[in-house]
Each structure stands twice: as C-alpha cells, then as structure tokens.
Curated annotation (Swiss-Prot):
Belongs to the GTP cyclohydrolase IV family. Converts GTP to 7,8-dihydroneopterin triphosphate. It catalyses: GTP + H2O = 7,8-dihydroneopterin 3'-triphosphate + formate + H(+). Pathway: Cofactor biosynthesis; 7,8-dihydroneopterin triphosphate biosynthesis; 7,8-dihydroneopterin triphosphate from GTP: step 1/1. Transmembrane segments: none annotated. NCBIfam families: PRK13674.1-1. Pfam families: GCHY-1. This is GTP cyclohydrolase FolE2. One of its GO terms (biological process) is tetrahydrofolate biosynthetic process. Its EC number is 3.5.4.16. The keyword Manganese does not apply. Keywords: Hydrolase. The record marks C143 as: May be catalytically important.
Amino acid sequence: MKDVQNEKDTRMVPLKKVGIKDLSWPLKILLKGDGYQPTVAQISCSVDLHREKRGIHMSRFIEVLNGLEEITPHIFEKVLDDLIVTMEAKRAHLEIRFPYFVWKESPVTRKVSPLKVDCFVEAEKEKNFSFKIGVRVPVHNLCPCSKEISDYGAHNQRAFVEIHVRTRKFIWFEDLVEIAERNASVPLYTLLKRPDEKFVTERAYENPKFVEDVARDVALDLEKDPRITWYRVYVESMESIHNHNAFACVEKGDFVLEG
C-alpha cells in the first residue's frame, strides 16, 4: 500500500509542530490522600516535521498514547521519547487538560460536596525534558473600593485563579488549589446551608480583594515554596456590576523581593 505521508516534499519547509488536538482520553489521577480519581482528559500532542517529509502518521500518536493511563513526570517523559522515536522527530510536545474534583466541607455545617477545578499538564522533550502542571480554581472575591465607598454592602463575584508551575520536587494539584483559595476573599463551596452562607458572605466582606491583590498574594506564596522553580499566575474576576471582566497576571522573574 502506498505510503503518501512518506513521500518526499520538495518545498523544503520544516514544520515546528504537527499533531493531534483535543483527543478525549480516560486517565487516573493520583489522590493526595489515597487512591485514584478517574477522569476524562483532553490531549493534544505534536512533533516537529523534517523539511523533506510530506506528513506524519497520525495513527502512531494513538498507538503511543495507548500506554498512558495515569499522570506522572516519568510516564510523560517516556511517552515523549516514544513519540520522538516512532515519528523520527527531534522534538515532541504533550498537553493534557482535565476536570478534577476536590471534596470540601462547608465552613459551619460541615456538609461535604465536590468542587470542580480544571487541571493542566504540559511536557516537552528535545534535548532536555521540561514539565509543567497547573490548576484553574474558582474562588469568591469582594471589591475593596466598592466596600469603601458604599453605605450598604459591596459588589462581589466569582473569580478564577490560574496557576502554572515548574518544580524540582513533586507537588500535588491539591497544594496549588489550597494556595489559590487561601489568597482569595473566601473559597468557593458547592454546597452551603444558611449558616454557611452567612459565614462566607461576612468573611468576604471582612477580606476584600482586587484581582491585583490576589495575583500578588498568590505569587508571594509561590515564591516561598522551595519545590517551585518557576510559576505564572493569572486571576480573572467575573465582574458583577460591569460589562467586562477584570484580570491580573504575574510570572516569576517579573519582580525581585527586597529585604
């Protein structure tokens, strides 16, 4: 059978990335406590393409991914190595996104319910292996300016804290979720009874924060964590009284701590 992908290409244009995108894939995520949580991930992966090759064999991505059942740096590096060998490439890239549920107790009545967060894993291999993980966590923010100038209440809304990190040691997704939540006005809960709602509302009012405040506070927490070698923080507020959202972002290296 004729191999069209292996035909010689005369245009002599190398391609940086060629691959598949948004493939749904079952995975197991290791829990911080014990056991695994099953999830359905969206996978995108690619390799570089030599200037004399017309195309890649897309089916080979799936063949390599058949060995991917859970998320660890060791497994990711093996998948990338296999892609490089199978595709006769110099560089391979892998990106995975998936929903993850953390179980939380409401602050007063201690009712337990799951909170969905979005998790990201990104890995690349050329000469060296690089690996990043991240989370996107829903939180609750109350506006300091609105509180200061209003006789009654203050506008408040959901916000999302997105954290991406590179680490020298293993770090749990739950650890990043905790960092995001403790630097917001108040965490978000799926299930709240009236005593819980009272607590959350009053706590947010006592702890007002701009998106700028949250981004800076999260960055300072990440700076102090010896496991983390690089980070990027992005905070977006779903503004309740404006016809736009507000955001703030910061990356390691954007500032130098004094003192």
